[in-house]
Regions:
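Glycine/threonine-rich flexible loop motifs
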Residues: 157-167
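Conserved small/polar residues in nucleotide/adenosyl-binding loops
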Residues: 272-278
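Short, conserved loop/helix-junction motifs that constitute active-site signature segments
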Residues: 175-177, 202-207
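Short, hinge-like loop/turn segments at secondary-structure boundaries
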Residues: 111-114, 200-203, 229-230
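Catalytic nucleophile loop
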Residues: 149-154, 168-196
């Protein structure tokens, strides 16, 4: 057994030039082979027909300020544990990406000893690999569309495309206008920026809302331990605050918050505290 400290150098991703996975130190500190599934007991599950629309990221690489690429995607715990709770609560999922290309995961964070979570991933593997194209969903949305909620999981991958997607913006506006729930965790709330008005003077539909999310200050610290190979080129918290959103937490903690029908969590460890409302 080695007594040497684990390296804080980001690990090369040989599939792409100048791309990196988190350091061994970061993986040891911030991932776990098992997740906490406490509270996933729903004695009266939903029995209706409405589903959950999960919008995943189809982006693998996020460019850093120093020109390196962070090999990212959706965080598996932030995706699959909320899915597990919702599944236990009686809901099924439609899975979509902006392009219709496969959902990208940060597999280095998969809780590989957690059979309930790896089993759920396997059960939805075909849907993750062959997701719906979001534009096709947008074209069919209406007041009677069969979705109870929109779920946008975290991981750094959503920063690469979702905040700039017209289709994501259209889905979120539909949810707000039709009294449906929006659920998001950690970096997932960056996707709320897709609702940014394109016309001067037009209001931001989420102005006045409060959320919890991964703090910008924490993202600024991650290169110090090699979690990311450089600093982000922008910070979603700053942009949301400028649009009138209040971010309640300043630390990476277990905090969650429900504001009207927007339900958010601050970090990968928030999922067990994410009190899922009746969203039918």
């Amino acid at each position: 057994m080695s007594i040497l400290p684990l390296s804080k150098d980001p690990q090369p991703d040989e599939a792409e030039f100048n791309a990196f996975f988190p350091s061994k130190f970061s993986l040891n500190e911030y991932t776990s082979p098992k997740s906490d599934l406490e509270g996933a007991d729903y004695p009266q599950p939903y029995t209706g027909t409405r589903r959950i629309l999960l919008i995943g990221t189809d982006e693998r690489y996020l460019k850093m300020e120093n020109g390196t690429l962070f090999s990212t995607g959706n965080h598996p715990v932030e995706t699959l544990v909320p899915m597990y709770h919702l599944h236990k609560a009686g809901f099924e999922f439609d899975i979509a990406t902006v392009s219709g290309n496969p959902v990208k995961f940060e597999f280095w964070a998969m809780p590989k000893e957690d059979e309930a979570i790896t089993g759920l991933h396997k059960a939805y593997l075909d849907a993750f690999q062959k997701p719906l194209k979001l534009a096709d969903i947008v074209a069919a949305l209406g007041p009677d569309s069969d979705y109870a909620a929109v779920f946008i999981p975290g991981g750094h991958g959503p920063l690469a495309g979702l905040p700039f997607s017209d289709e994501v913006g259209a889905v979120l506006r539909w949810a707000l206008e039709n009294d449906r729930h929006i659920i998001s965790i950690c970096h997932g709330p960056a996707a709320l920026l897709a609702c940014t008005p394109k016309v001067d003077g037009e209001p931001f539909p989420l102005a006045g809302y409060s959320i919890t999310a991964f703090p910008d200050a924490a993202d600024r610290m991650t290169p110090e331990v090699g979690y990311m190979p450089g600093h982000l080129t922008w910070h979603f918290g700053e942009k949301l605050k400028a649009l009138g959103v209040t971010i309640l937490n300043t630390e990476v903690d277990t905090s969650t918050h429900k504001d009207r029908k927007l339900l958010t969590g601050s970090s990968p460890v928030s999922y067990t505290h994410l009190t899922l409302p009746t969203i039918a």
